[in-house]
Structure formats: C-alpha cells, structure tokens
C-alpha cells in the first residue's frame, strides 16, 4: 500500500469521511471507455449500401462501421455474444456483426426483428425483404474478401415469419364439434418445416441447433444434433413404420452419443393404431427412450 501511495495510485478525498480509491489507467484495462461523441459522414454508408443493393433502395441507412464499433466496445470481453436489434431496417446490425466477426475471429450471433412494412421499391415488397437481401449479399461480399489462410466465418442466417400455430385451436361448443375436422388436429396448408419449427419452440430447442435432413418414404426426416429426430410423414402403414424406424436407428448409430434421443412424429400420420403401436415397439427395441407426437 505504501508503494501504491508513493506512486500516486491511490486517490484520497478531502477528509477521512471519503473512502480512498485505486487509480487505474486506460492502457491497463481490457476494455475501452466509450467516447461520448464521435463523428462520421453518413453519406459514405449510403454509397456502400447503394453499391450493394442498388441506388436508393433504402435511404439514410445506419453506418455499419459505426454500429460495428459500438458492438466491439460492448462485446470485446465476450466475442461470442448475442446481439439483438428490434428495428432491423436494412439489416445494418447483422451486416456489422458479420464484418466484426471477420475482423477479429469472433462468433457473435444476431437476432433481427422487422415488421413486414410495405415499400414501393423495385423487387422488394416489404422492408423485411430488403433486410434479408442485404444479409445475403453482405455474406457473399465478406466471404469474397476473406483470405485463404483464415478459417471461414459463418455468415449464414435463418429467416422466420410470425404465424398462427400449426395446431388447430380446440373449441368445444356444439356448433364446432365436427368429427370429420377433428380427425386431423393440424391446420391445413402447413409444411413439415412449419411443424418442425413449432415443435422446436414448444420443446425449448434453440433454432440455431445444427439440422440435417434426409428422406424416408417421400417425406423429410429431420436430425437435430443427433439428440432429436422428427418425422411428419402421413399414411404410415406397418411396413412404412418399420422402414422409418430402421432409418432412424441407422442415422442415430452413425454418430452415437451419450444424450437421450427423442423422436417426434405426427399423431395423425399413421393409418391405424396398429401401425402406431408397431412403430413405438420398433423404436423401443432399438433403444429409443422417448417418443412424442404432435
């Protein structure tokens, strides 16, 4: 302590009621103090976006270099941070995150939220369309500038739209008790990809979970990181149930892990109870612990 006092590293107050504090210099810290104001000409950002998307597609965009600078300041201690922007606009934040990851090797992720606000632009119906297209083109641009000596960064993204549930709401009033409609509890016109996303959300599975897709009997078979399999095919007979069970077992055994494996199927996908029971028995015999249906 005496040495710190002699070096001027202890700041004392005007009297004994003020607690002494340790003096630390900026070059001794792992983070930087954020400047209250810094200036950049926003016309440069407009020119870069015009070159990327076409002239005048999105006027007065935020500067991706400025946003990257702010993100760097708050994520430098954790380059794997998740960045959220509820007003995506032209997609500047996502572009900034990809640029920053390319510059420092970070693995930051981003979530962008944008209303489908209509726009009158050639080739674009909504602002969200512009957002997605900018991310696609920025991804290609960044990849083209990467050195062959550096590991490629992940610039991919997934796009989701807010929609009603794939599962029909239950209404027990007499005028709604249509037995023919009740046979299938899933909304019409939905794809197996739609079912997969809702299943992931309901089960708490991250949407960024690695996904592989195969095919069995003409319907997709989904593999989520080897711990969750999903098959939403229809008209599943006993023979087809055995075929699906064999495909699931073979795929799981390609890279067996210690985690428990769950299988999710479409409840109304089986032609009868015998096919469903046969499928469950085949999975149990193969060592699958959990079978769920939607």
Q: Regions from the language model: what does each represent?
A:
Residues 19-21, 45-47, 90-95, 103, ...:
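Flexible loop/turn segments at secondary-structure boundaries
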Residues 170-183, 192-193:
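Polar, glycine-rich mid-to-C-terminal structural blocks
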Residues 64-141:
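Conserved S-adenosyl-L-methionine
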Residues 154-169:
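A conserved beta-strand->alpha-helix junction
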Residues 139-152:
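Short mixed-charge
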Residues 206, 224, 230-294:
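Long, compositionally biased intrinsically disordered regions
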Residues 1-82, 104:
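Class I S-adenosyl-L-methionine
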Residues 202-221:
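Conserved helicase/translocase motor-coupling segment
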């Amino acid at each position: 302590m005496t040495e710190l006092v002699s070096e001027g590293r202890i700041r004392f107050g005007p009297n004994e009621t003020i607690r002494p504090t340790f003096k630390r210099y900026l070059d001794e810290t792992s983070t930087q103090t954020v400047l209250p104001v810094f200036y950049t000409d926003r016309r440069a950002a407009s020119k870069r976006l015009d070159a990327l998307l076409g002239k005048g597609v999105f006027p007065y965009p935020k500067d991706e270099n400025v946003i990257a600078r702010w993100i760097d300041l708050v994520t430098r201690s954790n380059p794997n941070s998740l960045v959220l922007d509820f007003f995506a606009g032209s997609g500047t934040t996502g572009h900034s995150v990809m640029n920053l990851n390319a510059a420092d090797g970070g693995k930051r992720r981003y979530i962008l939220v944008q209303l489908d606000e209509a726009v009158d632009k050639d080739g674009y119906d909504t602002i969200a369309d512009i957002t997605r297209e900018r991310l696609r083109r920025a991804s290609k641009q960044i990849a083209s500038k990467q050195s062959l000596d550096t590991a490629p960064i992940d610039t991919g993204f997934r796009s989701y739209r807010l929609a009603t549930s794939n599962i029909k709401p239950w209404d027990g009033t007499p005028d709604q008790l249509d037995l023919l409609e009740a046979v299938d509890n899933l909304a019409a016109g939905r794809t197996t990809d739609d079912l997969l996303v809702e299943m992931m959300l309901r089960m708490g599975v991250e949407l960024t979970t690695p996904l592989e897709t195969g095919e069995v009997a003409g319907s997709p078979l989904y593999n989520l990181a080897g711990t969750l399999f999903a098959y939403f095919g229809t008209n599943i007979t006993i023979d087809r149930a055995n075929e699906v069970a064999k495909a699931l077992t073979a795929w799981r055994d390609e890279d067996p892990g210690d985690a428990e494996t769950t299988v999710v199927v479409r409840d109304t996908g089986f032609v009868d109870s015998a096919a469903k029971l046969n499928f469950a028995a085949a999975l149990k015999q193969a060592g699958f612990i959990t079978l769920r249906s939607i």
